[in-house]
């Protein structure tokens, strides 16, 4: 009988699988027990909990391990019928369980220790504390400190050491994050470790509901390879909450200038089937109609009467947790945004922008493979965006109330009218592998593949200009892959992290050779590859003192907006090169309990130095602008922060940042003409700023009530908003000092009300590009939480 090629191949594959699985089956006969440590209230796995075990009757616990990020640890109890398991974690009561050796899986539920949670300082380290003590220059903001507050994410970030948020207006306005003197696209924004596409202005951070945040990680002058992304100045990783139990979180906020924010997030768990369903969304709107003095005409006070903003997002999720994978989940959502265009130097009354985005995400997680050594995670995301910018008015306005015909026939914002219909597609696939070599050595491999394409269309603009002004269909593919080796040496006093990163970019752009004439577009391609690396060390000579040093050869690939343009005022730029930087950090962290009469003292100092080349800059070209590699910058600075738990109920903090960002380019791009701005500070980047505040909090002032009252102050020194080449050019943003106060009341961990006043003294504040910000504002927020433990 003749054996087909298919049968032969099937037998070979079967034998191969048998040879692999049979030894694993034999190994599985050994007495290995999987323990999962969870929060008794919400069912979430607890990472870094200490688990120790011993045979019944043994005098002491000699074996121990820490749970992984999902709260799981595997132990081996050989030669005994029963054994005792001791589980501890800071803020929770110690659990003691007696197990029979026949048990293969067991869940340990830890209950919160009420005394410890009331402010009494305890020994041990939380997830936030573990991260703060990592070798990277990092600041971690605990989401628990933000819950229930009537404040935006941008406001929280703006008070962080080493970080500044440049704003242009009220809710929904464009903003940029500045870390160690680098800003905008050079700072990566991540959502649960996945890069967010917000550089095109489709989405703004101040829309994100603060109550869904678990923590915020701010990496400064360094971007860990485990994120698989590029960037120069650092990264902000927003980590959201995950709950394994049923919950409902609903809030509504009312603020000045007709600001409204509402959000609802829910989750339903079916523990027997391992199915988890989630749904939620938010809505934000604001009129932003505050008054301001027109720059360069400061005796003219006008009202922002064309700055209305509205957005909403709807999301749904289904997850399976009892399959071979620890989690298989699919998440889908839709985002919609509308905003009017407010003029500052010019009175714009008709231009507006509408955009939408459909999102799909899929996640696969498997941990504990290869004898609890290998963890795997795959994250796939797809987003499809549409954008419609409308500027077709035939009349223009000035701030004195005069109306006159548009100088260009149509339009208010530029040289040509617009009615765009742009479409974009972006696909990401991230694969992350963690492998534990030994107790003190581990490897991490992370690869992020990104594909983006853009299809612009603006017939009105093209007809008016005489050529295709919105650009042509374009696409790009990028790959960022990083391998990290982490070693803990000398009794775990020294932690060393070394990473190598590979960057690859290929773009295909249809563009015109010259915008001065009508011609057929030509396809231009650009391919580049770069290597970067990171070396970071932390040394802890004694408990509570950490010395950190790090270096990164940083690379940032041009993003979609820079390569493709925006179809409105920015042309494509096919020949862009990656930005490059040498980043250095040196600092120390002190964290001590019960010292100098204080419950806790935290003090840190960090110095940084960076050499940046091939910086991408927007430059004017004919009727629009395009991005070019045109800047070279050196940055040096220092930051320091002091946090004091004066008592279990009183807390105070203060931080100060100084950063000197200088242009060091010798000649103007493409010429031998001397650069007139060499040696000058870059405009729109504050060089000296500070934050400080105090807080009182207690859950014993009134029965069943948690009370928090706080004051925050923010100081920013005067800085330039444009180059000052002569003494006569006073292009400066004045010094500012702003105070915020607030009160938060929470009843039985379910109902909360927050009242806040921002800019208490109603100071006049200007920000980047001399944009006027709102004066005193009031905010009132109500929140209801169904699930205990969500706060």
Question: What residue spans do the PLM features occupy?
Answer:
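Short, acidic, small-residue-rich periplasmic hinge/interaction motif at the N-terminus
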Residues: 38-42, 49-54, 86-92, 103-147, ...
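Extracytoplasmic beta-strand/coil segments of soluble accessory domains associated
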Residues: 138, 154-195
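Short acidic/polar hinge/loop motifs at secondary-structure boundaries
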Residues: 194-221
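Short strand-turn segments of transmembrane beta-barrel domains in outer membranes
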Residues: 217, 224-225, 235, 241-269, ...
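Periplasmic-side early beta-strands and strand-to-turn transitions of outer-membrane beta-barrels
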Residues: 245, 253, 270-351
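Membrane-embedded beta-barrel scaffold of Gram-negative outer-membrane proteins
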Residues: 273, 286, 377-379, 540, ...
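Face-selective signature of the C-terminal outer-membrane beta-barrel domain
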Residues: 319-336, 355-517, 522-543, 550-552, ...
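Gram-negative outer-membrane beta-barrel transporters
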Residues: 493, 503-505, 600-611, 628-720
